C-alpha cells in the first residue's frame, strides 16, 4: 500500500500547473525542491515572488520586462517604422537570438482561437491597432506560428491594417535547414514554394 505525502503532492500539483509540465516531471521538480536546503528553498520561493511582483508588460510593445519600458523599445538604434508581431515573449526571444531583425516588436500574448474561445478582445490587438495609428509605421511583419491559430491571427491583423495603407508581411515557412523533401508534408512544401525568394 503506497503512502502519500500530502505536502509533496501539493507541491507537485502546483508544478503541474506550469505549461508543458506533466505529472512525472511535476513530481521530479517537487522532489528537487524537497532536496534543497531551507536557504535554497527560500531563495527559490523569493525568486518566484520577485518575478511575479516585478515583471509586467512594456507599455509600448507589451513585451515582458522588469523595467519601466523594455530594452528593445528603449534602444534608439532600432527601426521604429517596422513592427514584428509575435504571439508571446518566447517567440520574441527566439527571433532576437538570430540577431537579424533590427525593428521593434508587438507581443500579442496569445493567438485567436475560436475553438478555445480566444477572441480579439482576449489578446493585445487593440494596443497594436492604437500603436500603428499613432506612430509612423510602414511595415508590420506577422511572425505567428504556422498553425491554424497563427494563420487566423495573421489574416485578422492583415485585414485590419491593410485598408490603412500599412504594408503587412508574413514570415516565410517551409523546409527546415537539413530537412529532406520526402519527409515534408504537403502544406509545408506548398508554403516553401509560396515563400521562395530570388537566388
Q: Where are the regions that the model predicts?
A:
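Cys/His-rich Zn2+-binding cysteine-cluster or related metal-binding knuckle/ribbon modules and their
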Residues: 2-8, 17, 27-92
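Catalytic cores of large soluble enzymes that bind and process phosphate-bearing ligands
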Residues: 3, 36, 40, 116-120, ...
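Signal for well-folded cores of large energy- and translation-related assemblies
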Residues: 16, 34, 49, 66, ...
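Extended interfacial segments that mediate partner engagement and assembly in macromolecular machines
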Residues: 26, 75-141
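Short glycine-/acidic-enriched loop or helix-start segments at secondary-structure transitions
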Residues: 70, 95, 152-154
Amino acid at each position: 500500500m503506497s503512502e502519500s505525502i500530502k505536502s509533496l503532492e501539493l507541491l507537485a500539483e502546483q508544478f503541474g500547473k506550469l505549461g508543458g509540465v506533466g505529472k512525472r516531471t511535476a513530481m521530479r521538480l517537487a522532489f528537487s525542491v524537497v532536496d534543497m536546503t531551507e536557504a535554497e528553498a527560500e531563495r527559490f520561493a523569493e525568486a518566484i515572488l520577485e518575478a511575479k511582483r516585478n515583471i509586467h508588460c512594456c507599455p509600448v510593445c507589451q513585451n515582458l520586462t522588469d523595467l519601466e519600458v523594455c530594452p528593445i523599445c528603449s534602444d534608439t538604434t532600432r527601426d521604429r517604422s517596422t513592427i514584428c508581431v509575435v504571439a508571446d515573449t518566447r517567440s520574441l526571444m527566439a527571433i532576437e537570438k538570430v540577431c537579424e531583425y533590427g525593428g521593434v516588436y508587438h507581443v500579442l500574448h496569445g493567438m485567436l482561437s475560436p475553438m478555445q474561445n480566444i477572441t480579439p478582445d482576449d489578446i493585445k490587438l487593440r494596443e497594436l491597432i492604437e500603436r500603428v495609428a499613432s506612430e509612423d509605421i510602414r511595415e508590420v511583419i506577422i511572425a505567428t506560428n504556422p498553425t491554424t491559430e497563427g494563420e487566423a491571427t495573421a489574416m485578422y491583423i492583415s485585414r485590419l491594417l491593410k485598408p490603412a495603407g500599412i504594408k503587412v508581411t508574413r514570415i516565410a515557412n517551409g523546409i527546415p535547414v537539413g530537412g529532406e523533401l520526402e519527409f515534408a508534408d504537403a502544406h509545408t512544401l506548398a508554403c516553401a514554394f509560396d515563400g521562395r525568394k530570388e537566388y
